[in-house]
Design a protein with these regions (language model features):
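Active-site-proximal loop/helix segment associated with metal-binding centers of metalloenzymes
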Residues: 51
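Conserved active-site-adjacent core of cysteine acyl-enzyme catalytic domains
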Residues: 8-38, 42, 66, 71-152
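Buried hydrophobic packing segments
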Residues: 55-60
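Extracytoplasmic/lumenal acceptor-recognition loop(s) of multi-pass membrane glycoenzymes
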Residues: 63
Length: 152
């Protein structure tokens, strides 16, 4: 039997944390707080393969749209893909009067949005580069001294 274990982090995460001073709680070149948590953002547990509707309902409710994940399933979930496509997620948000802003894949920019009180819907690969397992989640906070990002 072969057991493998490992831990990796992205270069942008390492760079941000390297420049962040735990002693002062701030980095002179980055205007990020040490800790932020958007506690008012709702949480919806997901059904199997339903991370898209759950994550989208989370950000829509945070922007004052009264919607539940079940109401979004028919709009964004593609059964043959066992998931939701980005284009469907963007279109559904627009149907509810919300225009999504696509962010560059930059950790600092993402954290700045969260610090500004905006939860960020992210698509993350929970698998491997050669065998991806895509998953939607919502970033609702961070703790830079601990190197943690809070997801719903």
């Amino acid at each position: 039997m072969l057991w493998l274990s490992g831990c990796v982090s992205a270069p942008q995460s390492d760079a941000l944390l390297t420049h962040f001073s735990q002693e002062t709680g701030a980095n002179p070149s980055v205007t990020l707080a040490a800790r932020v948590h958007l506690e008012q953002v709702p949480f919806f547990p997901q059904e199997d393969f339903q991370c898209g509707p759950a994550a989208l309902a989370t950000v829509l409710q945070a922007s004052k749209v009264d919607i539940l994940p079940d109401a979004l399933v028919s709009q964004v979930y593609v059964p043959s893909r066992q998931g939701s496509l980005q284009v469907e997620m963007l279109a559904a948000a627009r149907r509810y009067g919300r225009i999504s802003q696509i962010l560059a894949p930059d950790l600092e920019g993402l954290l700045e949005q969260v610090q500004a009180g905006k939860p960020v819907l992210v698509m993350q690969n929970l698998g491997l580069s050669w065998y991806p397992q895509w998953h939607y989640a919502v970033v609702v906070g961070f703790d830079l001294p601990r190197g943690e990002i809070v997801l719903r």
